[in-house]
Regions:
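C-terminal motif of bacterial Sec signal peptides marking the signal peptidase cleavage site
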Residues: 7-10
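Extracytosolic ligand-binding ectodomains
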Residues: 12-426
Length: 426
């Protein structure tokens, strides 16, 4: 699993440059009184000799562990590279599992907020988990920065209206799926010249939100959405749903879902009357080796974040994608299996910079102002990360928002990740 390393090393830079800032390790005996915050959300006091507490909340077991494990490892690498904050070490404790579900997100968030020493969270992996975790984290005065949540409902409609699941203190380095939906719609309508398409979701906030974003954008371009329906994540027989879709005679089907359901859709669609030759399209949930190497995935188009990071450098640590991937493989024996590893690394350094800006040493202890942590992130502009330049809007969208579409060759996973056939940037 070395494809992501090839992408980072071989592809061109977007010409983002590092501002050269780095994390110094000030002595714990120094006094710092120019930190951000007004105390309105409380202050965390870290006693001398103790660690600053943050948490990783990601899907680290089950079918979506391929997404959460690289996220957690990205956080761990960022902590190691960043170093101490004002002489205090930072720890994630034991990684928590969001189970890629609302129940999992809620249970883990309850554990987090019960510990008043926790300052912030990197997670969740899945948008569905965030819908339940975010309100609890917000109410506790903490922050949560997600590397891979993409549902528009968690932030905004990009036109000034908060999403139904937006809560203050929530941020993300991942893109907003309104951009990904627009990218795939533009690709299908303008590049493939297909004017009739259908979409399938599984009811999850991520899959349904992205399918809807695609459908809306496709219709705005002049296309016709011939079908919009859902499957259950546990379904293995997709023929009834595909037969329903076939009735509309679409030229393409976009199914931004996960494995194993995505495996069955790709496998069974060509055998359904009326769908022979239909173009199959997926998204970042299927942009993984275990799916892309399946015979039924051959020739498919898959959208996701633009991984062509080139020489982009994280301004806090000086780390590039090439360096990150070399360290990741050395530490773990394999390359990341999912495309949000750099988003996780950048999310972690943002949190660490926010804590640094909102804290000072007093009588040998570190005082961290919770409101100051949010203040730093709310005003973030022009931060240079591995993924590019990050700036946070009023609803927590901080990511680079660049999307690519790749065409899959099931016999060449590494080459497929690099096989960009369409690029989109707002």
């Amino acid at each position: 699993m070395f494809a992501f390393a090839l992408v980072a090393a071989a592809c061109g830079s977007d010409d983002d440059s590092s501002s050269g800032s780095s994390s110094d390790s000030s002595s714990a005996t120094e006094e710092h009184h120019d930190s951000l915050g007004d105390g309105s959300l409380g202050v965390v006091t870290v006693e001398a000799g103790e660690d600053i507490q943050i948490r990783s909340l990601n899907a680290i077991t089950g079918d979506v562990a391929f997404l959460g494990i690289p996220n957690q490892r990205g956080v761990e690498q960022a902590l190691a590279d960043f170093g101490d904050i004002h002489g205090f070490s930072v720890t994630i404790g034991t990684g928590l599992d969001d189970l890629c579900s609302a129940d999992g997100g809620q249970a883990a968030a309850q554990t987090i907020v019960a510990d008043e020493q926790v300052v912030g969270v990197i997670g969740t992996s899945c948008s569905g988990a965030a819908t339940a975790a975010s309100p609890l984290i917000s109410e506790a005065g903490m922050v949560m920065i997600s590397p891979s949540n993409t549902s528009p409902a968690l932030t905004s409609d990009l036109a000034g209206t908060a999403g139904e699941n937006y809560h203050p203190g929530y941020y993300r380095t991942a893109h907003n799926d309104l951009f990904q939906g627009a990218a795939m719609a533009k690709f299908v309508y303008e590049e493939l010249e297909i004017s009739e398409a259908a979409a399938i979701h599984d009811g999850d906030p991520y899959t349904q939100g992205l399918a809807q974003a695609f459908a809306d954008a496709f219709e705005n371009l002049g296309g016709t959405v011939t079908g919009f329906t859902g499957v259950n994540k546990e379904d293995t027989d997709m023929v009834p749903v595909l037969t329903e879709i076939a009735a509309g005679s679409p030229g393409a089907i976009f199914f931004p879902i996960f494995q194993p359901a995505g495996d069955f859709v790709a496998d069974q669609a060509p055998g359904v009357s009326g769908l022979d030759g239909v173009v199959l399209l997926g998204a970042d949930g299927l942009q993984v080796q275990t799916f892309m190497e399946l015979p039924q995935a051959d020739g498919m188009y898959l959208s996701g974040p633009d991984l062509r990071y080139g020489t982009n450098t994280n301004q806090s640590t000086g780390v590039t994608a090439e360096k990150f991937l070399a360290d990741y493989e050395a530490n773990n024996g394999n390359a990341p299996e999912a495309p949000f590893w750099a988003h996780s690394y950048d999310a972690a350094t943002l949190l660490l910079e926010a804590i640094k800006a909102a804290s000072h040493v007093h009588d040998g202890n570190l005082e961290i102002d919770r409101a100051g942590v949010r203040e730093y992130l709310d005003n973030l502009s022009g931060y240079e990360g591995i993924i590019g330049t990050l700036s946070c809007d009023d609803f927590g969208d901080c990511g680079a928002q660049r999307i690519t579409v790749v065409q899959n060759d099931s016999a060449d996973f590494a080459g497929s990740i690099e096989n960009v056939v369409f690029s989109f940037a707002p």
